Amino acid sequence: MSDQYVWLLWSSAFLVPWGIIYISFPAHRRAMLWASLFTTPFGLSEPLFVPEYWSPPSLFDLALRTGFDIESLIFCFGIGGIAAVMYNLLTHRVPVAVPANERERPLHRHHYKALAAPFVTFVPLYFLPWNPIYPSIVAMAVGAAANILCRPDLKWKTGIGGLLFLIYYALFLVGLEWSAPGYIDRVWNLSALSGINIAFMPLEELLFAITFGMYWAGVYEHFTWRKC
């Protein structure tokens, strides 16, 4: 397979389980769609990572020519909705509204500060002399911690959700290496990373997966005042 279309096919592959779950579990559709619509715009951050983190051949060579690409939007849409509902699918729980009296608790005074934490964290860290994947990982970890501090009831969902998404994402990395052998070596800027791989998977990809899963596992409930 030509490397030109690998990123498109791999990002689109995330839409398959998304679609199956969306159709099969109507009770989780709102959370999935909400999360995916919020994560999709993060695909526009691709110029921050090309070529510092990786240089994926893309449709019309957009990534290499402009930093932007269509595939990143597809990718961000596909992973957001799944990360938001994996824990709920495992536990067979559906989020319900938080009672009004609970919203008045002292911890919830920091509701919006907690939600803003990863974005506030990322900006100053981005300007440090390191690869942009690292401030992304730290920012999501801070966001996950802030979610738990503000909403302690989300601690299990955050932790288990992160592990579930790590496993899910690792399976997609396996599929990527199987369908396009050597693609990770050719496309990721491995010389600019830690050099630590788990099998063929860069440690940074796995750290991205677990922190992304931890943060987005609880954002829907936190932002919309719901709980499982």
Place the predicted regions along the sequence by residue.
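Short aromatic-rich membrane-water interface segments that cap or initiate transmembrane helices
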Residues: 1-3, 61-78, 191-207
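Membrane-interface helix caps and helix-loop-helix hairpins in membrane proteins
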Residues: 1-2, 123-133, 151-152
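Hydrophobic alpha-helical membrane-insertion segments
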Residues: 34-42, 159-174
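Hydrophobic cores of alpha-helical transmembrane segments in multi-pass inner/ER membrane proteins
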Residues: 10-19, 73-89, 139-145, 204-220
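Membrane-interfacial, low-structure loops and terminal tails that flank and connect transmembrane helices
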Residues: 93-112, 227-228
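Alpha-helical transmembrane segments and their membrane-interface exit regions
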Residues: 41-44, 139-150, 168
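A generic, lipid-embedded transmembrane alpha helix
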Residues: 37-57
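Membrane-interface helix-boundary motifs at transmembrane edges
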Residues: 22-34, 96-103, 149-159
